[in-house]
Amino acid sequence: MSGDHLHNDSQIEADFRLNDSHKHKDKHKDREHRHKEHKKDKDKDREKSKHSNSEHKDSEKKHKEKEKTKHKDGSSEKHKDKHKDRDKERRKEEKIRAAGDAKIKKEKENGFSSPPRIKDEPEDDGYFAPPKEDIKPLKRLRDEDDADYKPKKIKTEDIKKEKKRKSEEEEDGKLKKPKNKDKDKKVAEPDNKKKKPKKEEEQKWKWWEEERYPEGIKWKFLEHKGPVFAPPYEPLPESVKFYYDGKVMKLSPKAEEVATFFAKMLDHEYTTKEIFRKNFFKDWRKEMTNDEKNTITNLSKCDFTQMSQYFKAQSEARKQMSKEEKLKIKEENEKLLKEYGFCVMDNHRERIANFKIEPPGLFRGRGNHPKMGMLKRRIMPEDIIINCSKDAKVPSPPPGHKWKEVRHDNKVTWLVSWTENIQGSIKYIMLNPSSRIKGEKDWQKYETARRLKKCVDKIRNQYREDWKSKEMKVRQRAVALYFIDKLALRAGNEKEEGETADTVGCCSLRVEHINLHPELDGQEYVVEFDFPGKDSIRYYNKVPVEKRVFKNLQLFMENKQPEDDLFDRLNTGILNKHLQDLMEGLTAKVFRTYNASITLQQQLKELTAPDENVPAKILSYNRANRAVAILCNHQRAPPKTFEKSMMNLQSKIDAKKDQLADARRDLKSAKADAKVMKDAKTKKVVESKKKAVQRLEEQLMKLEVQATDREENKQIALGTSKLNYLDPRITVAWCKKWGVPIEKIYNKTQREKFAWAIDMTDEDYEF
C-alpha cells in the first residue's frame, strides 16, 4: 500500500486509462498528497479519489455500497445517476453556504451586515459582484481545512464538458458585464473631474439684465467681515543701532517706530525737502519721552544709517526667497483674501477693493504738498465705522477692542469708514470696480454724457451769446465754460490756504497762469496756459481761441496783479449751478467724459484702415487713445527703465532683421533650385521658405509697431482716460467690428470692470 504512494501522476493516469478494473486497487494516499493533487487538477483528483480506499469509515462504507450497485441492472444505473446528481447538489449547497458564512462573518467583523447579494448586480461601493469562479479560493480553503470532507465521485466526460461549457458561459455573461460597467465608470471619471470645477465656478452676476433699485437705494442686504488692520510694530534687533550726535541712543518703542518710517525713506528725494523734514521732526517729537525730547533737538544730528541698511537687507532677503517661501506667503495672502476680501450683497458674493487698513507712515502727498512728512497715525478699531444691513452678522472687532459705530445705511455704498488725521478727510473701504454698484455708476456716467450729446449744440450757442453779455459775471462764466468744453479743463475746487497743494482748475486760474499772444507761430489769438493741474502735474498748452474769447480775457486781466484771480466773479458753486440749469446731472466731469468719448470715436473712424492687420489696428487704437489723453492732460514722467527697455527692443528688432535677411537668401536659393530641378519636392521647399519669410516679416512689423507705440506713449498715461473717461462700449464695438481680440485692448482687471459693456454691445454701437 505504501508503494502505491510512490506512483507519480502520469503513471496513475495511464493505469486508469488502460484498464477500468484498476479502479478497486488497494491503494491509499495520505491526506496531504490527496489535497495537493486536488489543487492541481480538480477533475482528475475527483476521479482518483473515487477509486481510493479511504482511511475514514464513512468513505469505506460508501465505496462498498457503490461496488454493489455496479453489478445491478439498468434501473440500478439510473438510480446511481440520480443519487450522484443529488450528491452533487448537496455538496454545492454546502459550499455556497460556507462561502456565504465566511462573507457574513467578515462583514460582521467590519461592523455592518450587508443585504443578500443579487446575482450579477454591482455592489453599492462600486465594485462588481464576483462570478462563480471567484468563489473557488473559498472552496479550496474549505477543502483543505475540513478533514472530514468526503471524497468526490467520478464525473463522466459529458458532465465535465457540460461544466466547462457552463463555466465559459458564466465567464462571458457575468465577467464581461461588470467589466463593461467598470470601464464605463472609469471613462466617466475624467468627465466628472472636468465638470467639477465648472460647478464650483461662480456664475458671473449679470446685474445689467435685472431691474434697477428705486432711486437712492444701493442694496437690500450687506454682510462682510470688516477690515484687516496693519500688523503691530516689531521692535528692531539689538544689533541695529540709532545714533544721535555720534553716540548710540536707545529709543522708546513709539519713537523707534516713527524713526523707522524716516529710515525707510532715507534714500528718497522726500527726505531732502525742508518741509518734509520739518513736519516729520515736529510729529516725531510728539511720540518721544521727555528724556528723548530733551536729548534729540536737531534732526541733522540723527543717524538712521543702520536702520536704513537693515530694511534694505530685509528687502533684498525677500527678493532672494525660495519658491517654497514665496508660495507660502502667497497662500497666506489668498487665505486672507478669501476671508476678508469678499462681501455678500443681495445674495451675491462681491469682491472688496481695499479691505486692508493702510499702515502708519509718513504722509507724502502730491506735488509740493504743505503737509508732507507728517505722521499718519495707526488706525485702531475704535476709529472704525462699520456699515452693514440690520439682519446681517456684524463683524467682530479684534479681541479687547470695539468699533466706533455700527450703521445700517443702504443709501451709501461703503462698507467701512474712518477719518484720517492729516487732512481730516474720510476714508472708505469700497467694493471692487467690477462690482454691481461700481458698474452701475459707470454706466450711468456714460449715459449722462450721451444725453449731453443731444443738447451740446444748444449749450454752445448759449455760451457764445453770453460772451457779449453786459454782466461781467455772465461773461466770465461763459468763457470758463468754453475752456471746460474745448480744453476739457477741470472746474477746480475751492481750497483752504495751506491745507493742500497749490493745484489749479478752470475757476481758480490766476492772471499769472496765462499769457495772451495776438499772433504766435502763424496763428492768431493764441492763449498760452501754464499752471499746476491735478496731482501737481503741469498743464502747458498753446491754444488758438475765438476772437471774442481773446478780447474778454484781455478785459478780465485789466488792472490785476499776477496773483489775482482771472475769473474774480466766478467760483465752482456758481458754475455747477449754471450747468445743472442747462441739463440735469451736468457737471464739468460730464463735459470731459463727453469730449473724451466723442474724440475716441472720431479718431478711431479716421485712423482705422480696413486692410490693416491686428497689430496695426492696435497701434491705431492707441493713437486714438493718446489723442484723448492729451486732451485731458493725462501726462506722466517717462519710466526710469524707458531707455533700457527701448534698447532691448531695438536689439530684438535688429536680430529679427538679420533673421529675415537670412530667410530671404534661403528663399532665393530655393527658387533657383526649383527652376533647375522642376520637381514637387523643391516646390514644397520654396513654399516652406516663403511661409518662413512671411512669418518673420510679421514678427518684425509687430516689434517695430511696439517700438513706435512705446516712444509715442513715454510721457502720456493712456490708462486714466481708458478707465475713467472713455465709454467702453465704443472700444468693444470697434473690437467686434474689426476682429481685434478684446484682450489686446483691455487687461483682465479692465475686462472685469467693463463686463457689462462687453456683454451688451454689438459692433454698430454709436456713442
UniProtKB/Swiss-Prot annotation:
According to the UniProt entry, the cross-link of type Glycyl lysine isopeptide (Lys-Gly) (interchain with G-Cter in SUMO) is at K105, K119, K155
What InterPro entries does the entry give?
DNA_brk_join_enz, DNA_topo_DNA_db_N_dom1, DNA_topo_DNA_db_N_dom2, TopoI, TopoI_C_dom, TopoI_cat_a-hlx-sub_euk, TopoI_cat_a/b-sub_euk, TopoI_cat_euk
Q: Which residues carry this modification: N-acetylserine?
A: S2
Basic and acidic residues bias (residue ranges): 1-23, 40-110, 131-168, 181-201
Q: Where is this cross-link: Glycyl lysine isopeptide (Lys-Gly) (interchain with G-Cter in SUMO2)?
A: 103, 105, 119, 136, 150, 155, 160, 166, 174, 206, 338, 551, 644, 702, 714
Q: What is its EC number?
A: 5.6.2.1
Q: How is it modified after translation?
A: Sumoylated. Lys-119 is the main site of sumoylation. Sumoylation plays a role in partitioning TOP1 between nucleoli and nucleoplasm. Levels are dramatically increased on camptothecin (CPT) treatment. Phosphorylation at Ser-508 by CK2 increases binding to supercoiled DNA and sensitivity to camptothecin.
Q: Where is this region: Disordered?
A: 1-201
Note the site residues: Interaction with DNA: R318, R366, W414, K445, T503, K534, N576, H634, K652
Misc: Eukaryotic topoisomerase I and II can relax both negative and positive supercoils, whereas prokaryotic enzymes relax only negative supercoils.
* Entry protein name: DNA topoisomerase 1
Identify the coding gene.
Top1
